[in-house]
Amino acid sequence: MTHIIIDGDACPVVDSIIDLTTETGIFVTIIRSFSHFSNQLYPPHVSTLYVDDGPDAVDYKIVQLSTKDDIVVTQDYGLASLLVDKVLIVMHHNGKIYNSKNIQQLLDKRYMNAQIRKQGGRHKGPPPFTKQDQKVFEQSLLKVIHRIKELD
């Protein structure tokens, strides 16, 4: 059964995922570190799992829990690279789907930017997340959900 796992520490589309999966039979797990604790109540198909605040603790838990039928939503290219051949789909919150063809290019870009920062340089960061970005993500996730439902 398909399950969506969210890298929840800095994910701007958590509410969209929850709304779009209501009444689909798809369960959602939000994984966060304790430093991002929230008392927010979610619908019955959503659970939240908290892990220690250590570096990459959320990533390790996602790798541990994910299965071949899962969809993972993360903006972390390193985590995506670990999951791209393990799970059904790995998505960025901008709606793009990671795959074995594009992940290496993204990792290379991340490495080059890290090298620039080490040398005291600067590079342009990502633009602010907009309502249009959210709509693009929602359309992409809906396509994924419809495709999965067709396979069931």
UniProtKB/Swiss-Prot annotation:
InterPro entries in the cross-refs: UPF0178
NCBIfam families recorded: PRK00124.1 (NF001095)
Family to which this protein belongs: Belongs to the UPF0178 family.
UniProt name for this protein: UPF0178 protein SAOUHSC_00689
Protein's organism: Staphylococcus aureus (strain NCTC 8325 / PS 47)
Lineage: Bacteria, Bacillati, Bacillota, Bacilli, Bacillales
